[in-house]
Amino acid sequence: MRHVRRALVVTILVAAAAAAVVAQAQPLGQQQASLQPAKEVAPPQPPVGSVSGLPVPRFVSLKSDKVNMHIGPAKTYDVKWLYQRAGLPVEIIAEFETWRRIRDAEGTEGWVYHSLLSGRRTGMVTAKAADDLVPLYDKPDDKGAVTARLERGVVANLKRCSGEGWCFVTGRGFEGYVRQTRLWGVYPNEKVD
């Protein structure tokens, strides 16, 4: 008797499922297309700081000739490093209230008070060897005339970067085009206006 009841319950369930499928089916010719237009997908956005709403990471520069880098996000934390060069490019890698965690060209990281940073874009000339000089051209082309040769560590103002390999820079006594890959302070393929 028990087996008969189970078989009956299973039969009822199978019949109900089949009836549901048949009820949803429509005769040929009466089927309606249910294609919906594809939803537009926004391109991925870079992460933004929880305080500023600006992209993180991003490059900025030091606003003052004396900037303390702390080991934590408050003046009560020990000073890790003292920068003495206004205009030095640094990378903001995190935000906490009025403090920004930065990284310098040598990879040193720490916290700086936000008002000691500027949105002015600068780049530091990089070279493989200390005596290596980086050519500055009169146009964005390796075949252009070399107007100057810049030493490693020279800081230049980024006026514009094409995002295609070249930046127009200015500094004390020079202006011209330099390969974007020879500057620390701008991302590869980043466009700067």
Where is each model-derived feature located?
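Bacterial N-terminal signal peptides that target proteins for export
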Residues: 1-11
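Boundary at the C-terminal end of the N-terminal hydrophobic targeting segment
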Residues: 20-27
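SH3-family beta-barrel domains
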Residues: 27-71, 82-86, 93-96, 103-105, ...
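Beta-strand-rich domains and repeat architectures in extracellular enzymes and scaffolds
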Residues: 78-79
